[in-house]
Amino acid sequence: MERIFVDKLFAAEAYTRNADKEHRAFEASKHIYDLAVISDESRISALFENEKLLAGLLSIRLTEEQNRLDGIPGVLPKDFIFFDEACSNPYIKKAYTTMQNQYVLIAKERIELDEAQTKMFALKNELMKCAAWLNAQIP
């Protein structure tokens, strides 16, 4: 679960930065939804307190980003913009509605974009308290 969470953070960032390119906004919207869903999980809350585990997962992902085709090899976690920008991006706003119509089939499991934005702000707030997040370096 913790690795999936970190992977989704990086994916949301990469796709948000390229939301104007084909299918990227749709992919960003899926990851934002997933992050909104799992952000309240106890294992994710515990990850914020486990600097060693978070640092290790970030190091692995930052290394992987160096060779990823759609990656963000020069972007440090502390510089991620998707927390603040994704839910106001016009491409992502449109794609988010489409994504929910296609993938979130149970009405009570839908998360409105405003709520997702609130959850992204809360995630950013928690991560910006973590030394592992703030001090992560590109290998």
Regions from the PLM with identified roles:
Residues 1-139:
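Structured mid-to-C-terminal alpha-helical surface segments
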